């Protein structure tokens, strides 16, 4: 028995090492070995099975090619082809290392159809080996030195892979270009190529045919390509490109791309139809999805508006115009471009006047610049251009330096945001005319503002004198009010803690459990409502910071006479928030009503509102994922208290990021209950003819039909959740193809790319599991049907539990946040009213209190 056990052990070890050696050898071919096509053909496989190299036939073709493709996924996209111009007609191909040390591909007649074509520096080529790596690189090297002799990365076809080095030599003009396939099923060299232009500042160029430019990326500034304005938004597209510096011994520099997440499978490809795409593998959908493509619009087409013309994407079509100081050469024919109206001083040979510069902002800089890297001062750059009569424009870009344009300005494009500033050289009369017009407009506006300001100041002083004259306790005869001056002592305050009735425009409001402040006390606390104490303005009116005599900091919301909100909202806050006590709801300390003054007094929030941090690029990093998730949980608990656990069942109806305040410890506090409604114990839904809320946060049934319920708040919470995770406003994408943040989130969710929605500032450090769960929950909350949305108890459970099962959400269709589209679609009778606040115009709560 012992003999058999030993024999079995030895046999197992032998088989293990044999299989191990076989698997290790599966990615290499040594001298004397070969890879053969045919029925029993087995491709070479990289160590982690990421890539394979072997023979294939594209589509329905019978031609055979040697290529590299992805190995461990269903869609085995081909990324490199050896014999793309010389296919083999049958399955007789053989890959081997020849006697001269070259890697060769032979057909059935032993004819070389492809070779690595290198000159051997040694007579002993027996130590050469070729292997496929997990990067997709096919490398011929020597076993004793492991030095690459030849590699496929230096001879690309149509695909740029991560870690591939794209060589460009500004001195010799050499560059490695990626050439498209001829068709979808024909790998032979096509009509389009993509590469780095070796002249000027490095930029990626897409050529058609014999080097006719079709698209370019704009100059590389060591961080982004300046002609791709959304590059800073596409984080995974941006953070990975690098340009080696300084040049190597041959004068070459190299572009590389290393993604922030190495586990993501991605590739850049130039297609046979003349577009460049970045494709990513979607494991959920089991397919490649397009992440970005160029050219992406009409204005991206190279030099669409001709020389000295500029293209602007207004609406869906690109609109051409001449830059200021130029006129069309041939009206209606933009291919001929524009020409200068007034010659420059040096062209007229006169000594009177001086050429000036007109600045164009947020533009794609023209092509064919002359870099002056040693000039980094704006004045030096300007002077360099002025001294050269051929200079038409200059620009100073961080990471590049000064750039001069001595030729025609071509391929100009106007962006909504991003881009660079270009200084156009014009005759003094052209700039002077433009400057005079601007000065006239500015002077007119300033005079108007000053006159309005003087009038407003006089009116305010008159009104303040009138108000303060009767602003002490019990002296106002127009109202029936009992007021306590709470700045004196706690004893005085407690004496008025019982039920106090005040009359507001003939309507009795019971302030049970809510102290009432005198106007005098608040005026002292806020230093007579001085401008320095103003924290902000909302739909209600201005909000002031104050300090009571006992040292407590307060925030005073003062109802403005021109407020979009009025007495009903004022009453609502008094009635509702005074009865609510929860750590995630803002605390109302009291109110004041004297004469025409109506004020609410809150606890002061030193960290202002959530949007103060969330939408400010300089402050986004201060709220990391741990803090954001804590804020999300706090808001959810506050809503659950309102919907289920408070003495009153309350629907907020205006939940948004600016109505979430942050205390000293960054705990979230839901605020602004002016639009809230009380629900009965068994009431599930109500209808209103007075639709209130904020565009982008209103649920479909509420905005369209006036129906509201606790599920209306759930919808708003879903939008808020997407904003917190992404760091984007819900209205920030309304001009994009997705129409809204909800539409963009749904697109990423269905394509298995939800992690791309996460704020780039926290994407690397956040809990991916929690972030994806938050996005999934948000998608459930913003479903069109209120019945299909979860309640807040379920939402909180899904957020806090790793084991909770999350249902598949239905596609939301009500995703547009455009004001005009919502107005058009309101299907309500003429008696219905709309009270709508907007994050872009005003906020119903201040930035801080």
UniProtKB/Swiss-Prot annotation:
Residues 295-332 form the EGF-like domain. Residues 529-814 form the Protein kinase domain. One of its GO terms (biological process) is recognition of pollen. Belongs to the protein kinase superfamily. Ser/Thr protein kinase family. Its EC number is 2.7.11.1. Residues 26-438 are extracellular. Residues 1-25 form the signal peptide. The modification Phosphothreonine is found at residues 688, 844. It is an enzyme of class 2 (transferase). Its main location: membrane. The modification Phosphoserine is found at residues 563, 658, 671, 732, 837. It comes from Arabidopsis thaliana. This is G-type lectin S-receptor-like serine/threonine-protein kinase B120. Residues 618-635 are annotated as: CaM-binding. Glycans are attached at residues 110, 191, 210, 230, 273, 282, 333, 349, 388. One of its GO terms (cellular component) is plasma membrane. Gene3D superfamilies: Bulb-type lectin domain, Phosphorylase Kinase, domain 1, Transferase(Phosphotransferase) domain 1. It is a single-pass type I membrane protein.
